[in-house]
Every structure is written in structure tokens, then in C-alpha cells.
Amino acid sequence: MRPDSLSAQIFSLATVAIMISSSYLLYIEDAEETDYDMRVPVWARNQQPFDTTQAYSFVLQQGPYSLLQTDNEFDSVHVMIPYNLPESEGGAAADPQCVLNFDPDKCPHISLAYWRPDVPQGMKVPVIAEIGPYFGEESAGTPDITQPGGWLGVSVLYNLLPHGFAFAQVSVSGTGLSNHCMDLMGFSEQEGINAAVEWLGTQEWSNGNVGLIGKSYDGSTPWQAAMYGDKHLKTIVPISGLIGVRELMWKNGSSEARAPFMHNVVYGSYGFSSEKGDENLQNACQDYLLSTLHSTNAYVFAGNEFIESYWTERYFLDRVLNNYRGSVYIVQGFHDWNVDPHMAVPTINTLLDHGIEAKVLMGQWDHDYPDRPDYQKDRSDPGRGSEAYPEMVRFDWMQDLLEWFTYYLQEKGPKPSLYLEIQNNHGEWRVEERYPATDSKVVEFGLGGNLTLVEEGGFGTIVYPGMEAVDDWIVFETETFDYDFRFGGLPQLHLQVTPQGSGGSIYAYMEDCPADGDCDELGIHVGHAIMDLRYHEGGSDYQYIVPGDTITAKMEFFAMDVLIPEGHYIRLSLRDIGEDYLPSSNEAAVNIELGEDSVLRLHEINFKNKIFFEPPVCMQEDCLEE
């Protein structure tokens, strides 16, 4: 028997191994006799009747509409959307059968599946869409695009579609059933994304408003779409999304281990399918074939290339600021190991400075959604989020999305509060207007002064190649704090250094240490920074280094929000590299010059003027075990 209700439809997904818990599938809550038209401030949501016992979050009230049935067992509709590319892009654009009009199906097409609510005749609805490379992708082992993804799609269908939203899933070029090349966020992919947005906004059943949401790669496609400034794109919700590809893989010139291989190795098999036949040949695009060369050259030159087109094509934020007129809701984890938080901070302030309505939700999780207690627990370690669990779990998140999309896509209801919601590493949530905050107090610690040198490395205060291999450090410590010291944002470490060669790199590791215990055993990570000295001025400008000349390395830590408890102190340790970063391509020993010009700069939070709040309390079994 065909499913004839939304709950039954979602239950049917379990039979085809959609990855979602049975408790979530079976959860049905009757609508409360409560007026939820008035927005409840975030600091009062813990008084609302959220179900906090499940593996996902839910809206407070089920919507009135069911899922519109189709002849597909998942009640979806699948279409292929044509779009134009210049022949210079290669792939499908240069396929002779396309160029000579022998077979239009060989021309560039984007694969799209959508679901609609069963609404009264004539009622038009907005569309929430997720765009990425993972739908029906053979190499990733993911379900067909006509099935809602268990990572997000099922939750959207259950919680948001009944409130009058359509939902769509879209495969980027060269993945799933979309032909052409896997372009890794390049021009071809961007054009296909824009074509999908335009198509969704112009259907007769659409009200013309489109919102994009997704995590990781799927959180980067919203930024790509926003570059075009399409009138139909009203809001984006990037979750751990990229503002640029090079920005993902290089920080201050230092290269992540995956950087030289990202395009061809990590995503190299995407787009190839046993069912595509000769369409597999369409992956022969210039950027795809040359991407390893670009990445290798960029590694040699610390993220810089003399031919910049590959990377500038894949940087989004500048064009978003120039063209986009919608809103942005950023979701980011402070401990995201995949997409570092510098994608969100200071991006959020940049958006606000350009008049874009924006908010950010930043908790102490890693590469995850904010409402997944089981994943968050499994992926949290000491100094990497566990001290903020289970307070990090946001069971009000789906309600937050409903209120956001209702205003920006349905154009009704009160405007959501554009609070920046920030969680520190001990679990405290607070509201900020900007982040980093503008009312912070700068506190400086001079290396060799109130940041005391307590341990030299094997060569004194010289950072040298190979320190990581022998676990050697240069260690500094502050005095013990006599109060709870809260700081956050983007701490800075400005070091006077003298490279003994034409390059070199420095890695800084910051810890919270108890005064009454061994920091090596009891200290926890609070943050880190990395720099290739060819970028010692900070930013993206390549610098030439003269061996023996003293320079200032203007290092910036990844975003952090930290509470150092009373009776604890800060330890700062230096060596050549750390985390998952590669050694510099021109390694050299670097002497750290102590004195007033070498400074750790922290931004103390003015906590007395902040609103702190507790989110709905997690009662799911993983939380209760804490």
C-alpha cells in the first residue's frame, strides 16, 4: 500500500536504509493549542515545550499540510535542467553531439528532485533547497537524489514542508545524474547552481522565493549561488560552508595535508558511474585536468600562484558582498576539523558592515549540525568540545529555521532577531551584536614578560624544522588568574622573529592549565594558530624574506571563545607545525625574539553587559549519561 500521510511516508524511508533513527521517524506530536506567531527570544526558549529526548530537533507545532503524492515511491519529482556553458569549459559544453545539436541531452544538465506540500489550488509556496555532490553519487554510496537525504532532507520534509515549503535536492555538475565535470566549486558548477535557483524560482507552483541550506560542500553552494544576486534567492543558511576553496586549505600560507590533492583525489572519482557510459568522458575539463598542478604550485608558493585564475574563480565572498541582497544565517562549530571557523569569523562582521541581514550560531561542536546529541558526543574530546556538552545541543534549531524561512521566504510573521549566538568552551551561551565583539578589552601578554618563558626547545628559543617529529616545544606561561577570565574572537600573536632562511613556519598551541596539577596531563586545548612566514604580514599578500632580517609575524588564531577558570593559567607553546598542516615548502629555522614587541593579545569579554542564556535542556540518552 502506498504511504498516504507524511508520517507514513517518512516511515517508508527506513525500509530503504535512509540513515535516521527509528525514534525520529516515529515521532509525531499533535499541534499545541498555543499561539506561536509571537517570536520567543532565544533566552526564553528553554521554557517552551520542545521535545529534547530525540536524536534530532523538531518544530514546536506540526504544520497543516501533508506531502503531495506523486508516482514516485518517495513522492518526489525528478527533472533535468539544461543550462549554457561556453565551449571553453570543455566537458559537456564541448561534446560534439551537443555542439552540433545532434543530441541536446549531451549538453550541460543539472539533476534536481523536489517535493511539494499538498496545498489548496492556486496557493504558491517557496522552496528550500540543498545543493551538493552527494546525491546518488556512486563513489560516496549515497541514496538516489529522489530520496530525501537522511542527514538533512528528511528533517526538512518532516518539520518544514508541512508549514508550506517545497524542498529540493540538486546535484552539482559532474556528480549524481548531473553531467559535465566535477568542477570543485568552479565556474561550471556555479552556473549550474544559478540555473537551479532560477528554475525553482520560476515554476508555476513557486512563489518565486528560494532559500538554500546545507553543510560542508552543501554549505558552500549557497555562497556560490549568492554571488549571482539572483532575485529569487532570498536567504542562505551555510552550515560549515566555504567562502573560498583556497581559504579552506591554506591559513596564513600554511597548507593543510589535503590541499595539494583536494580536487583530483578527494573528489576525483565523483561523476564517474557505471550507468553513465560515454558521459564519463565529459569529466575531461581543463580545471579538472590541471587542478593538481594548481594545488601543487600553490603548496610550493604557500597558497600563492603566479597564475591566480583557478583560485579567484573559487573565491565567493567578494562577489556576494557586491551582488547579493538576501539574508545569511551562518552555522559553524568552533572545533570544526574540516571547515575551520575562519569561514564564519570575521565573515559575519563583514556581512553586517555591508548591510546584509545576517546572524551566526556558533557552538563548541565540530563538523556537525547543532541538534545532533549523539554525533556531538562522539566527536567531542577534552579541549575539543567535551567541556561544553551537552549544553551545545540546540533542540530549538529546527524551530529557529522555521521562523527564519517563514519570514524570508513566505514573507510573513515577525522578523527573526538577528542575534549572534556564541557558546564558550565551558558551555555558556550568550548573545552578541557582532563577533568578534566591539566592546572587548584588549589584554596583552609579552613573551618573556608576563608570559614567562618556562621551557626552551632543543635549540633555545629557535623554532626549527622537525620539532613536531621529536615533540619539542618552546613553552611560555601566564600567572594564575584570580578570577574567571573570559576571552574570545580572534586572538593575535605578534612575534618578532629572525628567519635563518628564506621561509619557515610557526605553530602556536594555547592551553588552559590548572595551577594545582600537571598541565601535560590536565591541561586542555583552547586554540591554535599557524603561519608560513612568507605571509608574515597577515592576510593574503606574499612576502619575500631575507635570511637574517628580523620581521614581525602577525599571527591570528582560529576563532575561539574561552573561559579560563579562577585558579588556572594559560600556557602558550611554539614549534614549527601542528594539527594537520604540512611543513613549509621552504623550511628554515626561526629565532623567536623575546621582549615587548612579541605579544599575545587576547580580547576579554565584557560579560557583565551580555545576555547569557540556557537553551532547551537535552534529555536524550547520550546527554543523560554525562
State what each model feature region is.
Residues 1-33:
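Secretory targeting signatures
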Residues 32-66, 75-84, 93-97, 397, ...:
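Glycine/threonine-rich phosphate-binding loop and adjacent beta-strand/alpha-helix elements that clamp
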Residues 36-71, 82-83, 91, 137, ...:
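Accessory cap/linker subdomain of secreted extracellular hydrolases
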Residues 87-98, 105-118, 127:
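A short loop-to-beta-strand scaffold at the N-terminal edge of the catalytic core in hydrolase folds
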Residues 121-201, 373-388, 514-515, 579:
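Cap/lid segment of the alpha/beta-hydrolase catalytic domain
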Residues 188, 213-283, 352-403:
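A catalytic-pocket lid/entrance helix-loop region that shapes and gates access to the active site
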Residues 204-216:
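Alpha/beta-hydrolase fold nucleophile elbow
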Residues 324, 330-332, 336:
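Short beta-strand/loop motif that positions the catalytic acidic residue
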